[in-house]
């Protein structure tokens, strides 16, 4: 997975993720419909993360679960954690793991610090991003060194917590960047408490770079979760948008499943 890690160091990719996850804060973007979208001036909106948080809260309430220990695998620059923090008041420990050092650096800046962000990379040409001062930034989730939020540069296989530790895990749009999807599901199962909940999403945009064994490519997330180990809670689809350059806009449809460990 070293190649996967190194590919997430380029500044153009950083610009794309910052926009996809934080454009409402950094650039003041609002959700717009397709008819008014202009890729030269418009930003994609992070509605994906807000919809995931809303779905998670609804499912947990229906199950009568008040999660305390929460893990986000492949947490990128931290928007999922931000939404869960504000959505789930019962949380008392949050762990984000992300293999990219650059993404971890930005998640710490955006989630834990109140410093000026300086110039941030902005989506521009395929060769390189532009740079601009953001209009705003999110308020930090903690203002003191309270031991609530931990951010680790790590893969899912190296989460520094014991088995059956977390009662809520999110793993969003990571599957098609993992060499062995079935082993990833086993990792989630090991880390979850009995009756713990996982929110798992993927557009299943697999390719040979990240998952060279094509027998591991899937078309439905439910095929990874065996009924003898998991109960189905929800199954839906949520749009996930990216702007890789100012003329390359991509919309994925991520399948989102919510499962409860038996």
Regions found by a protein language model. Name each.
Residues 112-157:
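S-adenosyl-L-methionine
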Residues 157-169:
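A short acidic, Gly/Pro-enriched loop at the edge of an enzyme's catalytic core
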Residues 77-89:
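Conserved SAM-binding loop of SAM-dependent methyltransferases across substrates and taxa
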Residues 195-203:
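Conserved beta-strand signature within the Rossmann-like core of class I S-adenosyl-L-methionine
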Residues 182-194:
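A short glycine-rich, Lys/Arg-flanked "PGG" loop and its adjoining helix->strand segment in the class I
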Residues 67-76:
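Conserved class I S-adenosyl-L-methionine
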Residues 100:
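Conserved SAM/SAH-binding beta-strand->alpha-helix loop
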Residues 43-66:
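Conserved alpha-helix/loop element of class I SAM-dependent methyltransferases that forms part
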